[in-house]
């Protein structure tokens, strides 16, 4: 037998045996739930988003189920796909969407550049990786020549304006007087509410020390449905929205080798953030978290993306595999939404792009990020003060909801969105008379008013009865 073949078969058997051994053991828990999979060699938990979503659903009865989310999203994905194909047929160039980012570096007083208090350069190396991956940049690790590979046409920019209107570099260092955050529920209960920036204007990333006893790399919060017919909205999760990543897995050794990375080396190239932000934009693991090769209509029960081949488990390492040999195509181990090593990953697909586009168009907190201007020049103090004093009354409203301002500073304009992100009213504001918003023709339900002042905006929720 060929020596190379023998080694390959032996390695495959070894990895399979390792996977079996780990599954046979008692798997670790996060958020009070047994994790679905760990790396069979290192024991690391690649992602805890599925477990986190179960935790959020238990904590908040208004948070919709995955099935309800998919039912809400499915027609919007088809609409996004139709638009993409129409644009391709006319060679139309899509506008690149900008997502403003704030990175909260959570530390315990360690000197800058020591342990969890990572340097600005390590943070910025991660932003570079995100842009390489989400833009499928040529001559970078984010490039691929797969026919279904997609440029998601999303760029991440560090915020230049903080919530008070002051200039910032988008890196928010916070001394929380706590060595580690191995208790994940403390992150939701204490850390996030104390540090989160307005999630309608900033994409929040928390970089923390999970502690030596934790093998967790990171996790994310799925997008809001922004309301479903006959169901309550789950906007209550706003102050926890974003991604949380262990500092050892944030940034790129390729770009900034001086950073503080995990010594085993396989997760030090920035793909944990690429993966977790994919979840925030609506993407699922390519295996669908269900361990089967059974596919339904439109790849249902899996990741809802037909152009990612059927996969019945999470893949680790970089070994090519075909876990569903009776289905078309081998496992797409290079997909950012699998569990493989960072250096194996290089692709989002066209159908994954459709899904992301649907979320960015229809999920209110995701859609509002695209209109945020905090990545541009610093706003005036007057603009910030005018927005900070704005409230709505009465709420709930019947025939009118009033925009209440402090002082004589009026906003410039407002837009009213329904619970699925559609514009139902808008107006420029030139006098106090424009601050009374007529709601008599609106159906009962949840609505959002985005109020603009100069380069800034503020989004408020109201209920029509």
Predicted regions and their residues:
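C-terminal outer-membrane/trafficking sorting elements
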Residues: 383-393, 397-465
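Sec/Tat signal peptide C-region and signal peptidase I cleavage site
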Residues: 20-24
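Metzincin-family zinc-dependent endopeptidase catalytic domain
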Residues: 128-315
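Bacterial N-terminal signal peptides
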Residues: 10-18
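Bacterial N-terminal signal peptides that target proteins for export
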Residues: 2-10
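Stable alpha-helical elements in mature extracytoplasmic
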Residues: 119, 123-126, 187, 269-273, ...
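Propeptide-to-catalytic entry region of secreted or membrane-anchored zinc metalloproteases
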Residues: 25-201, 208-209
């Amino acid at each position: 037998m060929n020596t190379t073949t023998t080694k390959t078969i032996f390695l495959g058997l070894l990895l399979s045996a390792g996977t079996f051994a780990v599954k046979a053991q008692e798997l670790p828990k996060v958020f009070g739930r047994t994790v679905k999979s760990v790396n069979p060699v290192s024991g690391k938990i690649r992602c805890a988003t599925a477990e986190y979503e179960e935790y959020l659903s238990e904590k908040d009865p208004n948070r919709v189920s995955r099935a309800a989310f998919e039912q809400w999203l499915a027609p919007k994905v088809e609409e996004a796909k139709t638009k993409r194909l129409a644009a391709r047929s006319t060679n139309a160039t899509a506008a690149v969407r900008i997502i403003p980012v704030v990175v909260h570096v959570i530390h315990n007083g360690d000197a800058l550049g020591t342990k969890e208090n990572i340097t600005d350069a390590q943070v910025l190396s991660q932003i570079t990786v995100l842009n390489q991956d989400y833009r499928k940049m040529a001559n970078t690790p984010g490039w691929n020549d797969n026919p279904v590979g997609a440029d998601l046409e999303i760029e991440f920019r560090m915020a230049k304006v903080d919530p008070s209107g002051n200039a910032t570099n988008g890196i928010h260092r916070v001394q929380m007087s706590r060595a580690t955050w191995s208790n994940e529920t403390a992150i939701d209960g204490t850390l996030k509410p104390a540090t989160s920036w307005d999630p309608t204007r900033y994409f929040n990333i928390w970089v923390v020390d999970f502690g030596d006893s934790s093998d967790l790399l990171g996790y994310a919060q799925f997008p809001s449905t922004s309301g479903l017919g006959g169901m309550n909205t789950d906007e209550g999760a706003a102050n926890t929205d974003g991604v949380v990543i262990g500092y050892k897995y944030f940034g790129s050794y390729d770009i900034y080798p001086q950073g503080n990375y995990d010594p085993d080396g396989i997760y030090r190239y920035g793909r944990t953030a690429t993966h977790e932000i994919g979840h925030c934009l609506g993407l699922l693991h390519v295996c669908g978290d269900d361990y089967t090769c059974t596919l339904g209509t439109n790849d249902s029960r899996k990741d809802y993306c037909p152009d990612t081949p059927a996969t019945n488990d999470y893949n680790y390492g970089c070994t090519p595999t075909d876990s569903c040999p009776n289905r078309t195509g081998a496992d797409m181990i290079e997909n950012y939404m699998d569990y493989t090593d960072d250096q194996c990953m290089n692709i989002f697909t066209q159908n994954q792009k459709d899904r992301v586009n649907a979320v960015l168009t229809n999920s209110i907190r995701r859609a509002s990020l695209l209109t945020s201007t905090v990545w541009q020049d610093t706003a005036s103090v007057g603009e910030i003060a005018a927005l900070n004093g704005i409230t709505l009354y009465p709420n709930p409203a019947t025939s009118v909801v009033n925009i209440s301002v402090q002082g004589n500073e009026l906003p410039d304009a407002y837009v009213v969105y329904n619970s699925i992100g559609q514009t139902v009213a808008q107006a420029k504001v030139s006098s106090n008379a424009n601050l009374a918003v007529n709601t008599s023709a609106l159906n009962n339900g949840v609505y959002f008013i985005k109020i603009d002042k100069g380069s800034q905006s503020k989004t408020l929720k109201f209920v029509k009865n």
